[in-house]
């Protein structure tokens, strides 16, 4: 069974290879309770198709409304990444279903490079761990095969996330 990140990235790579506009959303910061952990990803196609999750529902619905059906759909033509924060106020946290006053910050990447996504998916299919770093100002992406997973890093200039095989532990025996 394919892990969720690979599933999301594979769909995103297919959409981009077919020339479809799309975005990749990554949870880069949370405060308080959050339905999905830092590093969770979701892909949204211009058609409104969604793969993956960043919140469990309401935020995904808002992203669909913003970027596939509404006035901000033009952003899908813009290559500059954006940070988007949900749950800043108690009313907003309630509206988007964020538990216990949680706040969530997303990095939105518009129209990631199709060739880079295909390389990423190929490395993941080969069972490699990959570190993907996005420059928030320029949108430039650097992907490198790495030896071990590292936690997501979000500094003032870059966001770096690791993708790769999931570790499994099997316990076999009686008793």
Task: Give the positions of each predicted feature.
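Segments forming oxygen-rich coordination pockets for charged ligands
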Residues: 1-175
